[in-house]
C-alpha cells in the first residue's frame, strides 16, 4: 500500500532516492526550493523521476503564492492570498483575480510536470506566525468566496484542490513547524467560524483533498488534529461527509513530535484517518518508517485509500511553450505580478 510522500535532498536524483521512491510504501514526493535551480533543471529532474522510478508517483509542491512559493525564477510571482481582499475593492474583481491566480499556478505547475500544489489555505485570520498573509481573510464568508474562485481556476486546468489546515490553524500564535500549538477556544466557536469554509466547499464538492493541522484543540480532543480520529473520522468523514483524500501535514515538523517517533507518528495518523503521509527533511526517519511500518492489503480501507490517491494525479498535460503563447497566461502574469508588488510595497510602508 502506497501512503508516504518523501522529499529529495538536491537538484538531481540520487540512486538512493530512486530506491526509496521505488519502495511499495512510497506514493510520491514533495519538492522544495532546494531542489530548484531553474525551470529547465526542474523539468529534467521530474523527467528523471518519471523514467527511473518504475511506478506512478504523485509529485507535489507548496506553490501557494506570496511567501510560500517554492519556484520563483521563471514563474509568475503569485500574490499572497490576503492581497485579493485587502487591495481590491470590487468583490467581483476580487473573486476574478483569485480565480486567475488559481488557474495561473495550476497551469504553470502542470506544464512543469507536477501533479498537485497543496492549496488553498482555508485558515481564518492573519495573526498566526505560520499562516499570516497566506490566508484569504479573517471572515469565513469572504474566505469561502475567494477560495472557491481560486479552486475553480485550479480545476479548469485539471489540478486537484487541497484545503488546509483543518479544522483551522488561524487562531493560534505558535508555529507548528517549531512546536505543538494549542487552540483553547470552545468547540462551538471553531464549528461556527473556522470549519465553515471547509464545510461549504465539501458540500459544493470542490475539495479533492484536505490537510489537517498539527494543532491541539484542547476543548475538543487531546490529540493534534492530524492524529485525531475525532477530527478526521467523526467530524470530517461522518459529520461533514468528506470522501476525498486526507493528507497528514509534514510529520517531520516539531508540532508532530507529540505523537512519538516517526513510525509512531505514521501509525497514529493512519489510525486516525489519514490516507497519505508527508515526512520531510528527515531522511533517517523515512528509512525507519520504510523498514518498520507494517501495512496490509487486507486492511479495511486499503482499496479506498488507493482510489483516493489516483484522484489526485493531474488531469491534463500542457507544454510550457504552449502555455507561454496563451493570452490568458500572459495577461495574468502581468496583473498578478503587479498585485504582489503592491502587496509587498503596502507591507513595507506599514513598517
Curated annotation (Swiss-Prot):
Q: Which positions bind substrate? A: 62, 70, 134, 164-165
* EC class of the enzyme, as a word: hydrolase
Residue numbers marked as site, Important for catalytic activity: 175
* InterPro entries (alphabetical): Beta_hexosaminidase_bac, Glyco_hydro_3_N, Glyco_hydro_3_N_sf, Glycoside_hydrolase_SF, NagZ_Beta-hexosaminidase
Q: SUPFAM superfamilies this protein is in? A: (Trans)glycosidases
Q: Which residues form the signal peptide?
A: none
Q: Which Pfam families match?
A: Glyco_hydro_3
> Which segments does the entry list as coiled coil?
none
Q: Which GO terms describe its cellular component?
A: cytoplasm
Question: One GO MF term, please?
Answer: beta-N-acetylhexosaminidase activity
Catalytic machinery residues = 177, 249
Asked if the keyword RNA-binding belongs to this entry, the reply reads no
Q: In which pathway does it act?
A: Cell wall biogenesis; peptidoglycan recycling
Q: Which HAMAP family match?
A: NagZ
Task performed by this protein: Plays a role in peptidoglycan recycling by cleaving the terminal beta-1,4-linked N-acetylglucosamine (GlcNAc) from peptide-linked peptidoglycan fragments, giving rise to free GlcNAc, anhydro-N-acetylmuramic acid and anhydro-N-acetylmuramic acid-linked peptides.
According to UniProt, the name of this protein is Beta-hexosaminidase
Amino acid at each position: 500500500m502506497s501512503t508516504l510522500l518523501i522529499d529529495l535532498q538536491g537538484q538531481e536524483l540520487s540512486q538512493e532516492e530512486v530506491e526509496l521512491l521505488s519502495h511499495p510504501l512510497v506514493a510520491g514526493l514533495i519538492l522544495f526550493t532546494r531542489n530548484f535551480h531553474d525551470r529547465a533543471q526542474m523539468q529534467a529532474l521530474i523527467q528523471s523521476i518519471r523514467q527511473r522510478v518504475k511506478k506512478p508517483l504523485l509529485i507535489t509542491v507548496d506553490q501557494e503564492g506570496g511567501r510560500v512559493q517554492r519556484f520563483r525564477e521563471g514563474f509568475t510571482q503569485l500574490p499572497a492570498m490576503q492581497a485579493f481582499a485587502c487591495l481590491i475593492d470590487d468583490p467581483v474583481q476580487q473573486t476574478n483575480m483569485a480565480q486567475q491566480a488559481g488557474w495561473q499556478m495550476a497551469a504553470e505547475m502542470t506544464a512543469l510536470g507536477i501533479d498537485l500544489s497543496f492549496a488553498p489555505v482555508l485558515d481564518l485570520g492573519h495573526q498566526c506566525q505560520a499562516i499570516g498573509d497566506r490566508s484569504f481573510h479573517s471572515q469565513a464568508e469572504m474566505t469561502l468566496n475567494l477560495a472557491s474562485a481560486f479552486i475553480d481556476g485550479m480545476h479548469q486546468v485539471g489540478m486537484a484542490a487541497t484545503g488546509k489546515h483543518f479544522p483551522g490553524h488561524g487562531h493560534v500564535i505558535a508555529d507548528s513547524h517549531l512546536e505543538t500549538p494549542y487552540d483553547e477556544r470552545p468547540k462551538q466557536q471553531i464549528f461556527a467560524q473556522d470549519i465553515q469554509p471547509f464545510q461549504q466547499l465539501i458540500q459544493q464538492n470542490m475539495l479533492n483533498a484536505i490537510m489537517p493541522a498539527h494543532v491541539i484543540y484542547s476543548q475538543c480532543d487531546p490529540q493534534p488534529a492530524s492524529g485525531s480520529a475525532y477530527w478526521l473520522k467523526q467530524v470530517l468523514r461522518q459529520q461533514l461527509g468528506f470522501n476525498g483524500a486526507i493528507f497528514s501535514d509534514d510529520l517531520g515538523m516539531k508540532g508532530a513530535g507529540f505523537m512519538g517517533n516517526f513510525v509512531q507518528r505514521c501509525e497514529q495518523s493512519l489510525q486516525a484517518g489519514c490516507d497519505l503521509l508527508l515526512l520531510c527533511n528527515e531522511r533517517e526517519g523515512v528509512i525507519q518508517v520504510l523498514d518498520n511500518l507494517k501495512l496490509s492489503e487486507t486492511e479495511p480501507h486499503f482499496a479506498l485509500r488507493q482510489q483516493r490517491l489516483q484522484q489526485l494525479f493531474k488531469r491534463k498535460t500542457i507544454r510550457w511553450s504552449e502555455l507561454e503563447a496563451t493570452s490568458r497566461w500572459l495577461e495574468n502574469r502581468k496583473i498578478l505580478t503587479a498585485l504582489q508588488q503592491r502587496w509587498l510595497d503596502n507591507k513595507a510602508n506599514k513598517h
